[in-house]
From Swiss-Prot:
Encoding gene, per UniProt annotation: aroC
NCBIfam families, alphabetized: aroC, PRK05382.1
Catalytic activity: 5-O-(1-carboxyvinyl)-3-phosphoshikimate = chorismate + phosphate
Keyword Lipid metabolism recorded: no
UniProt subunit comment: Homotetramer.
Keywords of this entry: Amino-acid biosynthesis, Aromatic amino acid biosynthesis, FAD, Flavoprotein, FMN, Lyase, NADP
Name of the featured protein: Chorismate synthase
EC annotation from Swiss-Prot or TrEMBL: 4.2.3.5
Sites where the protein binds NADP(+): 48, 54
Length: 356
């Protein structure tokens, strides 16, 4: 199975399944000498892990990271940095009754069509549990970016018809929806609770921002920064749309409204007075804040009875049991941050190699 690696100079390869021994990631190209803060890596994994609130799956996994190689006396060695996260609370018996049925909205049929064989336990490799490995790698990338003054923040912007009306970043970690508007967060929580009672699930939008990004990151034509971001974000399970800057709203604007006028900042650098472009022009970072939005579908695993077929194509009904998220949004927040961090650190390293 190809397609398990991402990046060029800072390249990650993830491995593992939802109900296997564990998951992990190998990072090639991590610069030597980085003082690696393991507590910071664990903190990001804790934000993504299951069982942290009633907005997430009831599966209990500590997601404790183990460094297997690439670190000595607290610093990276420049060799492959390998990290392991063990599975300790898988309950594979939940899937015994449906292992021959195709779950609506899942990759069961497409995996069978491609490989002729699949791991039916929690989706195997297609499970969103794989993103734990990405978050671990992204936490390393964030530490490198922090040395350059680059920071990232993400939050739940909307859930169904409910949308944050204010963006107070101090409120993001103060509620279980990771919404920057505390009043709307309470409405979101109630909406998810109702969906759970209805044996249903909900989708929405996560917004992620990167600040302190210098101008010049990204390559022309096929490796544009926005193309790389799209690649990264669309690889996240459940993500169905990605917008940068004004996104689809740009299609409703005139050029005079969508253009960002150039200005000279107080420090003498060049910037823009607005940011409809989302910090990227011609596929290259402009030094303005990078703004990305991800639309996530409702989780496909719901406890309602649904119609389907079995592997022989015979009609059947299915009820997906087990422990599942009623919405992916709170846990998508750290995953989105991680993927943007991975794109940016790779582009930073490429830019350093691009000119004397």
């Amino acid at each position: 199975m190809p397609g398990n690696s991402f990046g060029r100079l800072f390249r990650i390869s993830t491995w593992g399944e939802s109900h296997g021994v564990g998951l992990g990631v190998v990072i090639d190209g991590c610069p030597a000498g980085l003082e690696l803060d393991l507590a910071a890596i664990q903190a990001q994994l804790d934000r993504r892990r299951v069982g942290q609130s009633r907005m997430t799956s009831a599966r209990r996994e500590p997601d404790e990271v183990e460094i297997l190689s690439g670190m000595f006396e607290g610093r990276t060695t420049g060799t492959a940095l390998a990290m392991l996260i063990r599975n300790t609370n898988a309950r594979s018996s939940d899937y015994d009754a449906i292992k021959h049925l195709y779950r609506p909205g899942h990759a069961d049929h497409s995996y069978d069509a491609k490989y002729g064989f699949r791991d039916y336990r929690g989706g195997g490799r297609s499970s969103a549990r794989e993103t734990a490995a990405r978050v671990a790698a992204g936490a390393v990338a964030r530490q490198i970016l922090a040395t350059m003054g680059i920071s990232l923040v993400a939050y739940t912007l909307s859930l169904g018809h409910l949308k944050a009306q204010i963006i107070d970043e101090n409120e993001i970690e103060n509620n279980i929806m990771r919404c920057p508007d505390p009043a709307v967060a309470e409405q979101m929580i109630a909406y998810v609770d109702q969906a759970r009672r209805d044996l249903d699930s909900l989708g929405g939008v996560v917004e992620v921002r990167a600040r302190g990004v210098p101008a010049g990151l990204g390559e022309p034509v096929f490796d544009k920064l926005d193309a790389l971001i799209g690649h990264a974000m669309f690889s996240i399970p459940a993500v169905k749309a990605v917008e940068i800057g004004s996104g689809i709203e740009a299609g409703n604007a005139r050029g005079s409204q969508n253009n960002d006028p150039f200005i000279q900042r107080a420090d003498g650098s060049i910037g823009t007075s607005s940011n409809h472009a989302g910090g990227i022009l011609g596929g290259i970072s402009s030094s303005e804040e990078i703004v990305v939005r991800l639309t996530a579908k409702p989780p496909a695993s719901i406890a309602q009875e649904q119609t389907t077929v079995d592997q022989a194509g015979e009609p059947a009904t299915i009820v997906v049991k087990g422990r599942h998220d009623p919405t992916v949004l709170p846990r998508l927040v750290p995953v989105a941050e991680a993927m943007l961090a991975l794109v940016l650190v790779d582009c930073v390293l490429q830019q350093r190699a691009a000119r004397l």
